[in-house]
From Swiss-Prot:
GO terms for molecular function: DNA-binding transcription activator activity, RNA polymerase II-specific; DNA-binding transcription factor activity, RNA polymerase II-specific; RNA polymerase II transcription regulatory region sequence-specific DNA binding; sequence-specific double-stranded DNA binding. Residues 308-318 have a biased composition (Pro residues). Residues 133-143, 152-166 have a biased composition (Basic and acidic residues). It comes from Rattus norvegicus (Rat). It is found in: Nucleus. Belongs to the BAR homeobox family. The gene is Barhl1. Residues 33-54 have a biased composition (Low complexity). This is BarH-like 1 homeobox protein. Keywords: DNA-binding, Homeobox, Nucleus, Transcription, Transcription regulation. It comes from the Eukaryota. GO terms for biological process: midbrain development; negative regulation of neuron apoptotic process; negative regulation of outer hair cell apoptotic process; neuron apoptotic process; neuron migration; outer hair cell apoptotic process; positive regulation of transcription by RNA polymerase II; regulation of transcription by RNA polymerase II.
């Protein structure tokens, strides 16, 4: 019933897979062949007693793809520039298996144009092409790096030469503020300044202007000299006080520094603290009388003369006084 109506599986496959490459006088050829065996690559096996499996056909398709275009059944239909062998095999077999689709894909190196004789040109191996392209890119990169390095070296050298030339032409930049030149005083000017400083440690504005005019100096020069001289005087005074205090020689200290350190205590205590500052401005007063002489009395007696008897010494503790014997 299936054979009479023409709806059998074999009849449908035979009508759908019909190809002009198949011989017309063999109607049973499509009944005993699978769709994969109808491709031009498998026409050499015309025996229908042992049909090949689809896996074997796919393996043969992947291995025998380069020479598939030279089949005997397709010589009259294909021209040298029309269709490739895998595309024609896809059209004939109408197989949509993943293995057939992957087998039909050519590598990139195999897609070279055909020669004039109709035979495909021998493709160059992909590894050699990749190596050649890598070598070309490496050469270009080396050239660009070398040119860039040479340019940078030239620029650095040029900048260094420019800096050297500019440093030779221009004076070096000083970070610190340049110091002013010191005033060279003459011996006469120094003597007058020292004499004025002995009289007055601090000058008023009018006195300073008069002294500057008399010595042919500026007011700033006199003011600076007085400031430096007061600093030196205070430092010497502090050092002298320490040394003399350690030695205990207060009389020498009073003779050296009569004012303002050794005013009588009663006078200094009665003055206002603000008014006590004016003691520096006035002339130095004569040294006051010694309140407690530190020199031994026997030396004072020797200086006064031998006519007067020496005053009696105070008795020492723990020693009995002896009576004076007549001479």
């Amino acid at each position: 019933m299936e054979g009479s109506n023409g709806f059998g599986i074999d009849s449908i496959l035979s009508h759908r897979a019909g190809s002009p490459a198949l011989p017309k006088g063999d109607p049973l050829l499509g009944d005993c062949r699978s769709p994969l065996e109808l491709s031009p690559r498998s026409e050499s096996s015309s025996d229908c007693s042992s049909p090949a499996s689809p896996g074997r056909d796919c393996l043969e398709t992947s291995t025998s793809r380069p020479g598939a275009a030279s089949g005997p059944g397709l010589d009259s239909h294909l021209q040298p520039g029309q269709l490739s062998a895998p595309a024609q095999s896809r059209t004939v077999t109408s197989s949509f298996l993943i293995r057939d689709i992957l087998a039909d894909c050519k590598p990139l190196a195999a897609c070279a144009p055909y020669s004039s004789s109709g035979q495909p040109a021998a493709p160059e191996p992909g590894g050699r092409l990749a190596a050649k392209a890598g070598e070309d890119f490496r050469d270009k990169l080396d050239k660009s790096v070398s040119s860039a390095s040479s340019d940078s070296e030239y620029k650095v050298k040029e900048e260094g030469d420019r800096e050297i030339s500019s440093s030779r032409d221009s004076p070096p930049v000083r970070l610190k503020k340049p110091r002013k030149a010191r005033t060279a005083f003459t011996d006469h000017q120094l003597a007058q300044l020292e004499r004025s400083f002995e009289r007055q440690k601090y000058l008023s504005v009018q006195d300073r202007m008069e002294l500057a005019a008399s010595l042919n100096l500026t007011d700033t020069q006199v003011k600076t000299w007085y400031q430096n001289r007061r600093t030196k005087w205070k430092r010497q005074t502090a050092v002298g006080l320490e040394l003399l205090a350690e030695a205990g020689n207060y009389s020498a200290l009073q003779r050296m520094f009569p004012s303002p350190y050794f005013y009588p205590q009663s006078l200094v205590s009665n003055l206002d603290p603000g008014a006590a500052l004016y003691l520096y401005r006035g002339p130095s007063a004569p040294p006051p009388a010694l309140q407690r002489p530190l020199v031994p009395r026997i030396l004072i007696h020797g200086l006064q003369g031998a006519s007067e008897p020496p005053p009696p010494l105070p008795p020492l503790p723990g020693v009995l006084p002896r009576a004076a014997q007549p001479r």
